[in-house]
């Protein structure tokens, strides 16, 4: 699916269900992502690693579950941004926050 098809599909789904339904679904998907991340924390083989991808790629089921949940959350976020008409504003805010964090990192080094 190309980007245009993806966006058209997001719009169709968002318009069908509406903000109330999809905002509640987003909350559910975020909770599922939280649970998946927590499961990975409990796996001892990943303790004290900054980059878990050092360990055999995506072969662990906990990582695969996180990938699935990230996809669900991103799909729902795309719908919410469309429904609220705030995609551009979110991108601006992300850029601002990234630059601010890089400044903080630079000051601490």
Model regions: which residues?
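Flexible "arm" and connector segments at domain edges
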Residues: 1-109
């Amino acid at each position: 699916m190309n980007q245009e098809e993806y966006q058209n599909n997001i719009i169709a789904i968002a318009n069908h269900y509406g903000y109330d339904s999809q905002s509640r679904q987003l909350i559910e998907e975020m909770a599922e992502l939280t649970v998946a991340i927590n499961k990975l924390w409990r796996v001892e083989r990943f303790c004290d690693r900054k980059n878990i991808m050092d360990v055999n790629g995506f072969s662990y089921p906990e990582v695969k579950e996180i990938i699935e949940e990230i996809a669900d959350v991103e799909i729902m976020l795309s719908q919410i941004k469309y429904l609220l008409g705030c995609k551009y504003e979110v991108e601006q805010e992300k850029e601002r926050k990234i630059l601010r964090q890089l400044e903080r990192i630079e000051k601490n080094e």
